[in-house]
Amino acid sequence: MPSPTHLLNNFESSSSQGPPSYCLICCEVADGHHFGAAACRACAAFFRRTVQLNKVHDCPKNGQCFILSNVRNMCRACRYEKCLEVGMQRSSVQQKRDQLGRRDGLPTNREEPVLDTMRRAYEKLLVVRKKVHNRQENQLPRAISFNELQVVYQNEMTVIYQFLCEAFPEYSELLPDTKRSLFKNFFLPFTLLESSYYGYLTKQENVMLIPSGDYVDLAHLESYFNNNHHTFSQKDTISMFAQQFRMLHTSITVPLSAENVDVNEFLALAAIILWESDLEVEADRKNVQEEAVKIKSAIIKDLLFHYQSINVYADVAMRLGAVLSILPSIQRASHRFHEYMEIKNLLNLYALPKNLYDMFSPTS
C-alpha cells in the first residue's frame, strides 16, 4: 500500500494528457506545463518570482553554470536564461497575474504565494512524521489497534502545530490562546480530510490510512479492538465504529474522488478550514477575522492561478466552486465524528485520553 509520502512525491497532474517526464530546466520530474514549457514546480515558481519582482541576476561564471536539480545553490542567472531558452514566456506570467488582480493586503513578510508556502510546509511535515512515528525506510504498512492509534494522534498534535507555524507566519504571531482555539477547531477536520484524501488517492475503501503510514483495517475491526476495556459486546462495538467510518467515506472521500482533487486543492481546503473557524478568544477576534479574510482571498487567487497554469479546466470558476462545495461536507463529518466521540465517552466505550479528546473537540 503506498504511503502518504510516496503519494505526494509521485503525485501526477490531473491533465488527461499527463505531465511531461522531465523539467526542461533542471531535469527534475516535471509536474506540468508552466508558462509555455515543461517544468517542475520549483523552476516554475522561480521563473514566476523573477518576472513578477523584475529581478536581475548576475552569473559569476559568464553564463557557463550547470543547471541540474542536484546542484546546490544553482546560479539564478543561468537558471533564468535556461527558462527562456526552453520556451517560458514572461508575458504569460504577467497576463495571468493581471487577470487575478493585485495581492494588496497580504502580510508584507510573505515572499511567495500562500499555496507555495503551504506545500513546502506540508512536504516538511511528511519528513518530520517519519521521524516522529519512527518510520523506517521501506517499512511496510500494517493494521494497528485502537491503543496504537491514540499514540499516533497524540504525536500528531506537535507535528500539525509545527506545520501551521511553517505554513502561516500569521498563525505564529497570534496570541497563545488564539492559536490554541484555531488549532482545536482545525485538528479534527484536517485529520479527517487528510485521511480521506489519501484514501481517495489509493482507492482503498476498506482501510483508514493514518499519518504514521499504517492503517485501520475496516474489514477486520476485531483486530482494532484488542483489549476488553468496554461495556458493549464486540459485535455492537464493531457495528458502531463501522458506521462511523462509513459516514467518513461517504461524506469526504467520495466527494474528493468525484472531483479528482489535487494536492493544491487539498491544501487550499485545509487552509480555509483553519481560517474559517470561530474563536473563543474575544480579545483577538477582530484582528484574526481581518487576517483570515486576506489569507482566504489569497488562497482563492492562488487556486485560480494554479488552474490557469495547468490549463485543464475550461471553466476555472466552476472548478473552484466544485472544490469549495466539499467544505460543508467536511464540517458536517467533523461534527458527526465528535458526536460519536461523546457517545463513546459517556459509555466508556474505547474513550480517548482527556488531552486527545479535548483536542478533537471544537471550541465552537
Curated annotation (Swiss-Prot):
Domain of life of the organism encoding this protein: Eukaryota
Keywords recorded for this protein, A-Z: DNA-binding, Metal-binding, Nucleus, Receptor, Transcription, Transcription regulation, Zinc, Zinc-finger
GO MF annotations, alphabetized: DNA-binding transcription factor activity; sequence-specific DNA binding; zinc ion binding
Signal peptide: none
Keyword Transmembrane helix: no
Keyword Isomerase among UniProt keywords: no
Zinc-finger ranges (NR C4-type): 23-43, 59-83
Subcellular localization: Nucleus
Any one GO BP annotation for this protein: regulation of transcription by RNA polymerase II
DNA-binding region location: 20-95
A single cellular component GO annotation: nucleus
Its biological purpose: Orphan nuclear receptor.
Protein name: Nuclear hormone receptor family member nhr-53
Source species: Caenorhabditis elegans
